Regions:
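Short amphipathic alpha-helix with an adjacent loop that forms part of the alpha/beta core around
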Residues: 56-63, 132-137, 163-165
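Extreme N-terminal starter segment of soluble prokaryotic enzymes
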Residues: 14-18
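Conserved N-proximal alpha/beta basic substrate-recognition cap immediately N-terminal to
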Residues: 23-124, 128
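Phosphate-binding site of ATP-dependent enzymes
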Residues: 152-234, 238-248
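Short, Lys/Arg-enriched N-terminal segments with co-localized hydrophobic residues
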Residues: 3-13
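C-terminal active-site "lid" helix and adjoining low-complexity regulatory extension at the edge
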Residues: 241-283
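A short beta-strand motif that forms the metal-chelation/ATP-contact edge
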Residues: 64-69, 144, 186-188, 195, ...
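Conserved anion/nucleotide-ligand pocket segment
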Residues: 138-158
């Protein structure tokens, strides 16, 4: 039984792509379904593409040449299914985009502690109150679940409140509350810088505009791409610009970063999709 229609019979056979997405996933200011429909509409000009939820991937992945893991939402909602999928990727040597060999968000938030210890320009992060001396002095701190996503469970607290919560070591991330000018995100395919977007209004962080970054800004973001071990795929470097003008890493999303691709101009989109397809052709 064919994975797709027989429309390619007698013609050049297209690569078959299983595009994993959750078209019903809701997030404030982000239209996951619209973005993935746009991308797959472009991909179908060169590939046979089928979209499905990660929960259904096992039924189709053996028939695909490449499995593209995109806007699937937080894997916390289907953790066992996700880990079973990763096991099959390893055992069957499935070709995937992204590759699942990164050490940032796809492995959890431990990397923020590692980058802090390695003195990278990152918001200082600990996961135990016993290490509070590592952090710069602050009147207010941010705490959030170490295995959380989408700001679920995030809270702003004082040091006194932290000490009164009996936080179990290793369960919560603790950071100083950083006063910043704006947030900015840098988007890469493999090691290629694609574009940058920023939120000029801190109270409306989901409203993004194209950001004209400097060579120094790109070099900042590239440090984290080079630190990471993703062989191929899309990565998003999220940072904040402090009031002193310094960039600090907020998050390195290397699993399924939302791209805000519809917020950039057509020329940037065209280059992004061409670079994405160039990588897919090499798999």
């Amino acid at each position: 039984m064919s994975f797709l229609s027989e429309r390619t019979k007698g013609y050049i056979i297209m690569k078959k792509i299983l595009y994993l997405t959750d078209l019903s996933y809701k997030a404030k200011g982000r239209n996951y379904s619209e973005e993935d429909i746009y991308i797959t509409d472009k991909l179908k000009n060169k590939y046979d593409v089928v979209l499905c939820h990660p929960k259904c991937a096992v039924s189709y992945e053996d028939y695909a040449d490449i499995v593209v893991f995109r806007n699937t939402g937080s894997v916390i909602g289907y953790k066992d299914i996700y880990f079973d999928f990763l096991k099959r990727v390893s055992e069957k040597k499935l070709k995937t985009f992204n590759s699942f060999d990164g050490k940032a968000d796809m492995k959890g938030k431990q990397y923020l502690l590692e980058l802090t210890a390695e003195k990278y320009p990152v918001i200082p992060t600990i996961d135990s109150v016993d290490d509070i001396s590592i952090l710069p002095k602050s009147d207010l701190f941010v705490i959030k679940p170490k295995d959380g996503a989408d700001s679920i469970g995030l809270d702003f607290v004082t040091l006194e409140e932290i000490n009164g919560r009996n936080i179990c070591p290793g369960t919560m991330l603790i950071q100083p509350a950083i006063d910043f000018q704006y947030e900015v995100s840098f988007y890469f395919i493999d090691d290629k810088f694609e574009y940058a977007l920023y939120a000029p209004d801190k109270s409306k962080r989901w409203i993004l505009k194209e950001y004209n970054c400097t060579d120094e800004d790109i070099a900042f973001a590239r440090r984290f791409i080079e630190w990471n071990t993703v062989t191929h795929g899309i990565q998003r470097v999220d940072a904040c610009r402090t009031n002193d003008g310094e960039l600090l890493l907020v998050e390195l999303e290397d699993l399924n970063p939302y791209l805000s691709i519809l917020d950039v101009n057509e020329k940037i989109r065209h280059k992004f999709l061409n670079d994405m397809m160039e990588t897919l052709e090499m798999l």
